[in-house]
Amino acid sequence: MDKSKRHLAWWVVGLLAVAAIVAWWLLRPAGVPEGFAVSNGRIEATEVDIASKIAGRIDTILVKEGKFVREGEVLAKMDTRVLQEQRLEAIAQIKEAQSAVAAAQALLEQRQSETRAAQSLVNQRQAELDSVAKRHTRSRSLAQRGAISAQQLDDDRAAAESARAALESAKAQVSASKAAIEAARTNIIQAQTRVEAAQATERRIAADIDDSELKAPRDGRVQYRVAEPGEVLAAGGRVLNMVDLSDVYMTFFLPTEQAGTLKLGGEARLILDAAPDLRIPATISFVASVAQFTPKTVETSDERLKLMFRVKARIPPELLQQHLEYVKTGLPGVAWVRVNEELPWPDDLVVRLPQ
């Protein structure tokens, strides 16, 4: 290579070096103001699985992925034909048990009527016994004086004994009637228990039918469908996955020196890569109590400062409700926090929201 070509090559290398320095200078990250900290993060939200409470076949799914849903909105339905038949069977069992209760109550009334009749007979037999007993007493007195024959005395004695036997028989009938009453009451209790059991079964099946309509537990957005209509799921099988749009936050990491100064409820600003012109307000909702990752050895104070703590900055729910169409999980960005809360936010970090 001749001398002129070598000079040209050096000029090219020099120009490239100058260009690299200028590019680095122009594209270098802006310095972090004193009293502030910044860290990379990603938008996240609480995920909620929509699952079937009982085993069964998916009948229909009413929402598509990405759809915004409100709390209580029906998202999917399970096939309830078997449950409907089981409910009809339970209703029939209720009616049958109620009929048994009515029959047992009628039998109780009959036994009570029989007891009253038996008690009346006891009273009658008691009166008859009292009458013949008095006659027998008089007959003995008259027989001792020879006023009546021995045959008459024997007849009066036999009549008294017969009346006493009749009274005992009537009393036994009363006791039997009372036992029948207790048995009838037991039958009523058993029949009522069957009614309650059948009603409990019907309520449980009705609850299962109601739970077969899978509803949104809160406001949110459907992320993806885990299953499709026609699939058979076990109890607890997932059908949909959704995100709770009332709990959206950015997770990021800060070193010990900065994380230790943060307090829950402190202000933060979020800047998303997809919307670099916006400045989203947030509040510190979580600071880890232990470091999330550390160097292999921690011996010096400088190394201790390298310990990184996980932090969450939560976007206010009322702000989310105003801009639901912009909420997307997984978006990367940066989070700014104030290490010194007495400092005002710089002009570049003043809240700017979509119009």
Swiss-Prot record:
Residues 1-19 form the signal peptide. It comes from the Bacteria. GO terms for biological process: transmembrane transport. The keyword Acetylation does not apply. Keywords: Signal. InterPro entries: CusB-like_dom_1. Residues 128-155 are annotated as: Disordered. Gene3D superfamilies: 2.40.30.170, 2.40.50.100, Helix hairpin bin. The keyword Cytoplasm does not apply. GO terms for cellular component: plasma membrane. This is Uncharacterized protein YhiI. The lineage of its organism: Bacteria, Pseudomonadati, Pseudomonadota, Gammaproteobacteria, Enterobacterales.
